Amino acid sequence: MQTVNKQAIAQAFGRAAQSYNQHAGLQRLCGEELASYATRRQGQKVLDAGCGPGWFSQHWRAAGNHVTALDLSAEMLVQAQALHTADCYQPGDIEALPFSDASFDLCWSNLAVQWCSDLSLALTELYRVTSPGGQVLFSTLSADSLHELSAAWQPLDLPAPVNRFLPFDAIAHAGQHLPLTLMQQTLTVGFPDVLSALRSLKGIGATHLHQGRHGGLLSRRHLQQLEQHWPRDRRGYLLSYHLVYGVMHRE
């Protein structure tokens, strides 16, 4: 179990709500891959758990589904509602879903469960509110994600603003009591400069540490050091994400 400050996470994503869609390329790429595992596309009651500003809520609604958008961040829900992305909007925590058993045909959670204190509980909750014959689809980040950031930060006399993600084996263990199938993918994204890479993390609310929060501003000298040590190639300054996709069919 991880030590997670839910209020701080909600605030971090709340601050990012207005700019989230500009920086959410990873979420969209990951979500498109996750959607490929769906057995049905329309005519379902769908829960988007950890909906953010509702990009995939809108995707599922446009496909002909009744969508409930849930998020820990009130600001994200305001953004989702302003864009008319779903049919219902519900503040809530994935680890304590405010729904009855078997409420949805599809429980969808794209890059949200990594913020949970207890992944096993989160997966159990998603499974609980899924109807028999329905499906749970989720994606998350695993250990070694953002290793380029860790490597570049090491020479600096500062704590790296890198969240601690669970290793793949721990993710599998969290769902061992459930009919869970996992797939893995590594996605590497290039940025034109170090600031763009850092802003991509801040823009999606992902700079909050599970255990404490990095404080202080980066100096010009720090940025120069990061540029020297940050792994890069023809694509630019790199950030790699180790993605895990989970599929559960409700029995």
UniProtKB/Swiss-Prot annotation:
Pathway assigned in UniProt: Cofactor biosynthesis; biotin biosynthesis
Gene Ontology biological process terms, A to Z: biotin biosynthetic process; methylation
Catalysed conversion reaction: malonyl-[ACP] + S-adenosyl-L-methionine = malonyl-[ACP] methyl ester + S-adenosyl-L-homocysteine
Keyword annotations from UniProtKB, A to Z: Biotin biosynthesis, Methyltransferase, S-adenosyl-L-methionine, Transferase
Pfam families attached to this UniProt entry: Methyltransf_11
Entry keyword annotation includes Ion transport: no
Molecular function (Gene Ontology), one example: S-adenosylmethionine-dependent methyltransferase activity
InterPro entries referenced in this protein's UniProt entry, alphabetically: BioC (IPR011814), Malonyl-ACP_OMT (IPR050602), Methyltransf_11 (IPR013216), SAM-dependent_MTases_sf (IPR029063)
Enzyme class: transferase
EC number of the protein: 2.1.1.197
S-adenosyl-L-methionine recorded as keyword: yes
Domain of life: Bacteria
Matches recorded under CDD domains: AdoMet_MTases (cd02440)
PANTHER family, sorted: ARGININE-HYDROXYLASE NDUFAF5, MITOCHONDRIAL
Xref: NCBIfam families: BioC
Known function: Converts the free carboxyl group of a malonyl-thioester to its methyl ester by transfer of a methyl group from S-adenosyl-L-methionine (SAM). It allows to synthesize pimeloyl-ACP via the fatty acid synthetic pathway.
Protein family membership: Belongs to the methyltransferase superfamily.
Protein name: Malonyl-[acyl-carrier protein] O-methyltransferase
Organism whose genome encodes this protein: Erwinia billingiae (strain Eb661)
